[in-house]
Amino acid sequence: SITSLEGEKVDKLFFRDEALANKAKNYLKSNSFFIRKIDERTISRKPKAPFNTSTLQQTANSQLNFSASQTMTIAQGLYMGIDINKETIALITYMRTDSITLSKDSIDTIRENISKEYGDKYLPDKPIEYKSRKKNAQEAHEAIRPTDISIKPDDIKDFLNEEQFKLYDLIWKRTIASQMTSAETNQSTLQIDCEEKNITLKAILGKLI
């Protein structure tokens, strides 16, 4: 990303017209660049909570480009059941909920799956508990999760349409990740200058440990 142009700091609103954008583009094409400084650090990212209705809609919109109503329609189908090997199987729990909590039984099953499939390296010493910050949250239901965490998305891909697969995959991965250890990332920040000193850049590279 560009951090400065002709000595002026660049922020999100900097490129207010096409002329500025073209100027930056020309500098990028005509200059020779070199790395001035490298900063390295380790970042720990805690897992996100399981989905409730609003976070499922938001994430499906940002990652899958599904509208809120589209997400709920697909989720309804997964909740009502999918025909798999001549049997109708409900794949997710009730999709209208404010809750981000999971039952003890489901947490135990998820942790067993993590240990078996990924190894104890990715399993915290204790279960991770999530509580809603929203006052008066309707928590009669659990968070949205697969009814059977052992049913992997790829195992049932042939029985789902494309949209169903994408949403189930999203829910399954979020549920598994919610009970895993924090992700450790080695992050390198590169400060990049040019010989003409009319534009500076920053690049951030990350690698999971």
Model-derived segments and spans:
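Core catalytic DNA strand-manipulation module of type IA topoisomerases
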Residues: 1-209
